[in-house]
Amino acid sequence: MKAIVGELRRTLRGLVKAPSYALTCISVLALAIGVNTAIFTILSSVVLKALPYPTPSRLVFLRERFIHVSDPLFEHMQTARRNYAEWKRSATVFEDIAAFHQSSLNEIVNGDTQSVAVGFGSADLFPLLGAHARSGRLFQPAEEGAGHDAVAVISDEYFERRFHRAPTALGASITLGDSIYTVIGVLPPQFQMPSTDEGEDRIEADVWVPLSRLFKTPGDETQRQLLVAARLKPGVSQARAQAEMNGIAQSLAKSDPDLNEGLSVVISSFEAEATSPDLHQALYVLQAAVLLLLLIACANLANLTLVRASLRSREMAIRIALGAGRARVAAHLLLEALLISGAGAILGLVVAQWAVKLILALKPPDIQRPETIAIDGTVLAFACAIAILTAALFGLIPAMAASRTDIQGALRAGGGWGASAGRKRASQVLIAAEVALALVLLTGASLMIRSFQNLVATGIGFQTAHLVVADVALPEKRYPDGASESKFFHTLLDRVRHLPGVSGATVTDNLPLHSVSASNFFFAGRPDPPRNALLIADFAHTSPDYLALLRLPMLTGRALTEADLEATEKAAEDPKGGEGVCLVNQAFAREFFKDEQPIGQRLLESDKKYACRIVGVVADYRPMGAENGVRAQIFRPSLRNRAASLVVRTAAPTDAIASGIRKTVYGMDRDLVIDKVQPLDHWVDDWQAQRRFNTLLLSVFAGLALLLALAGIYSVLSNVVASRVREIGIRVAIGARPRQIGMLVLWQSMTPVAAGLAIGLAASLALSRFLESLLFQVGPRDPLTLTLSALAVLAVSPAAIYIPLRRALAIDCMVALREE
């Protein structure tokens, strides 16, 4: 034990005597370990950590999909209450099965109206998720039936905001929409609903009410508005559950074809949907990137340690000659590396804490509850493992070198292994490795940058600048039919168009990147397609000037008019009294008419109640973002919308327009609440956010990698020049010109750089395929990107070479020859 303590003291004294070396190593490691720990902290919290539910591996979602429709909007559909009831009755593979729905309702508090996020949940939802009331109680099965008192369970956040945690909250009455509810319980603060691969399904409701409160008319039973969750019985696999649900779906297709023909059930686990696929892959790519950065740091430090070992070769030789033994000397160097790594890891945790806060400040998309992301035991264990790994990586080569020290040579000239060809080769190999790894990271970052540039350049098909959006939802009790809805939106448009700074206003229920929806349709006068070949298109019910406001050009035919709006709404009131008109986009014309003329063709919506005649074809845009391309679209003039988006074109500040819109709506209906008024650019930013986040972080890591590689080249080349001062002096003395000296230094430096570039290009070709799903309109092996990345590394390399080269050219031969 005394020997170990003594060795530890000697090692610490040695590091104190070389502060520049120790501080440089600790700083580099703190940065490398810090960013690794930061990314792992997020990865662990978001992807690796178990979900906060009992036996989360047995929890699944149940959805429906059309078997023969390849449209993302129809691949993960919610289900109708009628089907949910049949699943609950017939399925034998589930221990529990529950359903829920998200919405918002207006609440009147002290005469003021505010919007409240409301969850409609079945009585078995909370037991399924292992939730218990913090105070009071949760729903009972009997409260789901009709005729029972309206009860509510509130979130902890709402308990604080609305009732200031007063115990009188239990039993208090709250008015939501047209109903009064009695608060019976409060959920614990840690309760959270599961994430899904469709962001809109995630619920962080302020208030929960029984599921039965969602269904007010018999027609509501067939509306697909429920997300179903279930817990598999112990020992039941997801495949077995899928097989049983397929059988139930087939039975429902026969017994209830109007609702279920052509449908199947899709089962997916909570764990698979806890993070979006894009975020999941992005975090693993970023973790791989920072691990490469760590390897570059280790190579850099290994080179520094080799330089230090060459300077200490005489000391090491004396220790070996005095009987310390080669193994003990090697152990001393490994202990030194371990101490440096330990200090770097401790400081790295501080860097990680700061880096996590900085990364979360960038508001990475799809990360739910970022406030729960923190360094925990798992992260500390990771940091310790990284510290041990780095000690081995950058301490092993010098330790092996020490074990092969030429004792006689070191004692005679102080050169030892430090001046040998072996050390030079090792340094060059490490430089080549640094350059190769830096090129891999730079190539990945360049691919992401080009991809993001393509995404921004492609856009959604029209300019979103100066467009402001406000969502308006009309309560059924005060607006019971299409006529009352149309009257409201007519009046709203008329008033908003007269607001200062407004150059145009329109209404739509199908807004790009926000509220895209699709439906099946029919061609009037043609046979209905079979259920396995449905005709699908996006339906947008808009005011006539919607496309003009977006500045989308007409390609053929004519634009919509106010007369078209009047005729279409009249046809909706009385289908026998005439027909409406509509526009289609170019993608619709290509898909369904090919060489035919679409003008004059008649369409029927899915319920076949309303017919419309095509009067024009408009240019395409990409409603679900550039990655998803254009979609077939139908535009009907109609203001008969229960919920719609008001779109305003204005050059005025958003806050001023928002205030004007809210005052206008308040003047029309005091009980309507406009929660958010946002620029359409906001939705574009959200759509681009994940790629922007990935590109930014990967670019930062690539930049750090390149700086470390340049620092490595500089340190090695400086040492080469310093160790060859006598040789250079002799060359100058016998007539070598500065150009020849310069070429000698350049050859010494650029050989490992060139080797690193070759290896890096090969590695980039092999590894860039892992980025393929994150790229847009650029291939993972894009030759231009690979070439430019290699040229970039080659172009900045002279910055690391310049100072050592100047030193070599400035050597005085007389001074050099007088040195030993």
What are these regions (language model features)?
Residues 1-22, 270-276, 304-331, 335, ...:
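Alpha-helical transmembrane segments of integral membrane proteins
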Residues 1-23, 53, 112-113, 147, ...:
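Membrane-helix entry/capping segments
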Residues 18-46, 50, 296-298, 341-345, ...:
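Short, strongly hydrophobic transmembrane alpha-helices
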Residues 31-65, 306, 355-364, 437-466, ...:
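Alpha-helical transmembrane segments
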Residues 39-42, 302, 338-407, 450-451, ...:
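Small-residue-rich transmembrane alpha-helices
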Residues 51-104, 223-229, 455, 459-521:
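Membrane-proximal extracellular/periplasmic loop immediately following the first transmembrane helix
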Residues 118-141, 150-281, 357, 444, ...:
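Mid-to-C-terminal secondary-structure elements
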Residues 297-341, 711-751, 757, 770, ...:
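Interfacial "coupling" helices/loops that link adjacent transmembrane helices in transporter permeases
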